[in-house]
């Protein structure tokens, strides 16, 4: 029996490739969000993109006519803060972090209580990678130097998300997973990823809103991050074909959604 969307109250929405592409909001997204509210539900924008803060996303959605507040977002940057705090006990106990990431990502980490440095010569304790739209070769070189140096094995290697590419209007650009891939090839070290497909972000959203797993639906365009996150979090998921993933990908994927839809408009018609 196919899942009934009308039973769902919490909708976890991926962003890039699911509700918009670059600065173009997909048709039906605004109506979908309004319908969720009318039905007494809640939606959380849940993105693996760590290059922007919640404030950045609020401003971006506002230009598309979508009103949102900080509590409407769970980003992979939030997952990083949650994960590092779980591992080290507190942000202050994590030591110095060398970040391969944007200024916006760095600002959020500092706001959350972490110490960020751009000097690899200092006593760095953690190498952290995100989706870095400000990437330089020096950052990559510094990251490799840290992991291969005398203290390399004692340095924690973490990353926001394993996405290989980010969809844009002209196709794709390298995402965090590709950046980490270069470092892994050079050093043999793999990072621990905190974002999707790990269940952490979905669990954070459910805890924040108070909805159960049975009441939750995750909607995304990537099988290996979005749909895998749904499986790992033990919640239903919807695979939309408006972004990276295709039906051909679905045929061979170990990650299977509860439903497949061309785009958000199809879900709206079933509510």
Each language-model region and where it sits:
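Asp-based, Mg2+/Mn2+-dependent phosphohydrolase catalytic module
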Residues: 2-13, 20-38, 52-74, 81-271
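Conserved phosphate/oxyanion-binding catalytic-loop motifs
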Residues: 49
């Amino acid at each position: 029996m196919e899942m009934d969307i009308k039973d769902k109250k919490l909708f976890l929405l991926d962003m890039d490739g699911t509700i918009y592409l670059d600065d173009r909001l997909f048709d039906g997204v605004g109506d979908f969000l309004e319908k969720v509210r009318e039905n007494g539900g809640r939606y959380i924008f849940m993105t693996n993109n760590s290059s922007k803060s919640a404030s950045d996303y609020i401003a971006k959605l506002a230009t598309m006519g979508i009103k949102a507040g900080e509590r409407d977002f769970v980003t992979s940057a939030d997952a990083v803060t949650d994960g590092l705090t779980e591992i080290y006990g507190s942000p202050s106990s994590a030591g110095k972090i060398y970040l391969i990431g944007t200024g916006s990502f760095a600002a959020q980490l500092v706001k959350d209580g972490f110490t960020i440095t751009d000097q690899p010569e200092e006593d760095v304790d953690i190498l952290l990678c995100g989706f870095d739209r400000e990437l330089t070769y020096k950052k990559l070189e510094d990251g490799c130097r840290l992991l291969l140096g005398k203290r390399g094995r004692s340095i924690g290697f973490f990353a926001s998300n394993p996405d290989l590419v980010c969809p844009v209007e002209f196709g794709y650009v390298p995402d965090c997973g590709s950046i980490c891939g270069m470092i892994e090839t050079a050093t043999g070290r793999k990072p621990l990823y905190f974002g999707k497909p790990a269940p952490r972000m979905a669990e954070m959203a459910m805890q924040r809103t108070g909805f159960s797993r049975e009441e939750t639906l995750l909607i995304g365009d990537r099988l290996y991050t979005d749909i895998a996150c749904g499986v790992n979090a033990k919640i239903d998921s919807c695979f939309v074909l408006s972004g990276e993933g295709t039906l051909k990908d679905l045929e061979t994927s170990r990650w299977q959604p509860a439903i497949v839809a061309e785009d958000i408009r199809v879900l709206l018609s079933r509510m």
